[in-house]
Structure formats: structure tokens, C-alpha cells
From Swiss-Prot:
Family as reported in the entry's similarity comment: Belongs to the neurotoxin 10 (Hwtx-1) family. 24 (Hwtx-6) subfamily.
GO terms for MF: ion channel inhibitor activity; toxin activity
SS bonds (residue pairs): 2-16, 9-21, 15-28
Highest taxon in the source lineage: Eukaryota
Domain text: The presence of a 'disulfide through disulfide knot' structurally defines this protein as a knottin.
Entry protein name: U1-theraphotoxin-Hhn1a
InterPro entries linked to this entry: Huwentoxin-1 (IPR011696)
Species of provenance: Cyriopagopus hainanus
Keyword Disulfide bond in annotation: yes
Tissue specificity as recorded in UniProt: Expressed by the venom gland.
Length: 35
């Protein structure tokens, strides 16, 4: 189960596709890959 946008995370693998973990804030955000 992956975390959606703004979901809490500790690393990128916790987030859904096209999302990456913002380690400074501890939530998932867009990682810049849309293709």
C-alpha cells in the first residue's frame, strides 16, 4: 500500500507512483516524473 500526495513517509518507496518523499517535511509530493 502506497501513500498518496501529502501522505506521511520516511522514504520515496513509501509513496505512490510519480510521488517522492519530501524528507524535510515527511510527506509525499510530486517528484517531477510524469512520463
Amino acid at each position: 500500500e502506497c501513500k498518496y500526495l501529502w501522505g506521511t513517509c520516511e522514504k520515496d518507496e513509501h509513496c505512490c507512483e510519480h510521488l517522492g518523499c519530501n524528507k524535510k517535511h515527511g510527506w509525499c509530493g510530486w517528484d517531477g516524473t510524469f512520463g
